[in-house]
Amino acid sequence: MKILDWSQLDVAARTDALTRPVQTVAAQTRNAVAALIADVRTRGDAALREITARFDGVSLERFAVSEAEFAAAEAAVAPELRQAMQDAVARIDTFHRAGMSEGYAVETAPGVVCEKIVRPIGRVGLYVPAGSAPLPSTALMLGVPARLAGCRAVVLCTPPRKDGSVDPAVLVAAWLTGVRRVFKLGGAQAIAAMAYGTESVPSCDKLFGPGNSYVTEAKQQVAQSGAAAIDMPAGPSEVLVIADAGAQAAFVAADLLSQAEHGADSQVLLLSDSDVLIDAVQAQLEIQLAHLSRADIARQALAQSRLIKVQTLDEAFAISNRYAPEHLILALREPRAWLAQVEAAGSVFLGDYTPEALGDYCSGTNHVLPTSGAARAYSGVSVASFQNMFSVQAASKAGIAGIGECALILARAEGLDAHANAVALRMGVAA
C-alpha cells in the first residue's frame, strides 16, 4: 500500500488520495441490462429460462424452491453452521427490534390532531448474490428486518448452481428468518423479475440487496422507471481505520484485509498519527497476505488503497467525515470518547476487539450499508427500510376556526384561491 503524509499533500493530491476506484458503467453494460429487463418484462418466465441457461449454465423449468429442497438444505448444512446462523438471527432481531419506529399523535392546536402512522411495505424483494461464494449472512441481514416490519409478501432471489440447486446455507438462512418464497434466479434478470413480475415471480414494491455491476445497474434502471424502489446506492466494499500509536498492528492489518478480499475494486484506508504503527501495519499486511486464499484479489484492492499519516487524530476525523466510509473502525485507546466526532459513516466499530467482521455476521447490526460516500445522506438497512410512514390530520369545527385564518393568509400570499376557498367555506367567511 502507498504511504502518504497528509501534511505534504496539496489540495489536488488530497482529493486524489480519497478518490475511490473509478466506478463507471459502460454503455455496453447499460444497454445489455436494459435489454434483459425489457425481455423479462415482455416474455416473463420464458425469458428467464433462456437468460438463466445462457448466464448460469443450467436449464430450469421451475424457479421456485420446493419444500423438499428446503428440507434437503436443512440436512446438508452442518449443525455448527446452522447454530451460528440461529445465534446471529437472535442478535440481529434484538438490535433491530429495539430500533423500530412507532407512530405518534399530537394535538398541534385545540381541536387539531396530527398523527404519524407506520405500515409495512406490502411486497419486498431480497437479492442474495452468489458470485465467488454464497452469502447466507446477507439473507439474514435482509430477512430479519423484513419479518419484523411485517411485510405481507417477502420474495428472495439467489443464483442457481450448475446442478440447478441453491446453496443450502442460503436456503437455511432464508428459512430461519421466515422467508419461504425463494427463487433460483440471479443477475439483472432476477431484479427485473421482482420489479415487474412474471408468471412465477410476484412483482415487489421495493428491492434490497447487493450484487455485481449488472445487478446494481438493473436496480437503478427499475427504480428510475418507477417499477420498484430500491434500498440505497450500491458500490464496492470499503473500510477506513483511524488508529493511534497503541493500536495492534496485526489487528489493523487483518481488518484492512478483510475488506480488501471482497473484490479488486474494494478500497481500504488507514489514518494514523503514528509512523511506527503505519510501518508495522505495512509489514503485517505482507505477512498475513501469504496465508489468504484470496490474496491476489486483496493485492489488487491494496494497490488502490492508502496508509495516510496525519498530524493529529482531529485531522483524521475531518478526513474520515469527508470520505464518509461504509465501515469506520476506531482503533483508539478511548474510542467512545471520539465517537462524537463521527458525522458520516455506515457503521462504526469501537476499539481493538471489535473487528468489522463481527458486524458482517453476528454482532446484531446490519451489514447492508451505504458505500461510495453515500453515508453522508443514507443509512444502513433497518426495519424502517421495510416500512412506509404517512401522516394523518383531523380538525374539528372549532379546530379549523382556530387555525383557518393562518391557512387563508398563506394561501392568499401564494395566489392559490381554491386553497383559500376550501378553508373559507368551512369557516363561513369570505375567501
UniProtKB/Swiss-Prot annotation:
Its EC number is 1.1.1.23. Coiled coil: none annotated. Keywords: Amino-acid biosynthesis, Histidine biosynthesis, Metal-binding, NAD, Oxidoreductase, Zinc. The keyword Zinc-finger does not apply. The active site is at residues 326-327. It comes from the Bacteria. Binds 1 zinc ion per subunit. Substrate binds at residues 237, 259, 262, 327, 360, 414, 419. Zn(2+) binds at residues 259, 262, 360, 419. Its cofactor is Zn(2+). GO terms for biological process: L-histidine biosynthetic process. GO terms for molecular function: histidinol dehydrogenase activity; NAD binding; zinc ion binding. One of its GO terms (cellular component) is cytosol. Pathway: Amino-acid biosynthesis; L-histidine biosynthesis; L-histidine from 5-phospho-alpha-D-ribose 1-diphosphate: step 9/9. The keyword Zinc applies. NAD(+) binds at residues 127, 189, 212. It catalyses: L-histidinol + 2 NAD(+) + H2O = L-histidine + 2 NADH + 3 H(+). Belongs to the histidinol dehydrogenase family. Catalyzes the sequential NAD-dependent oxidations of L-histidinol to L-histidinaldehyde and then to L-histidine. HAMAP family: HisD. This is Histidinol dehydrogenase. The lineage of its organism: Bacteria, Pseudomonadati, Pseudomonadota, Gammaproteobacteria, Lysobacterales. The gene is hisD.
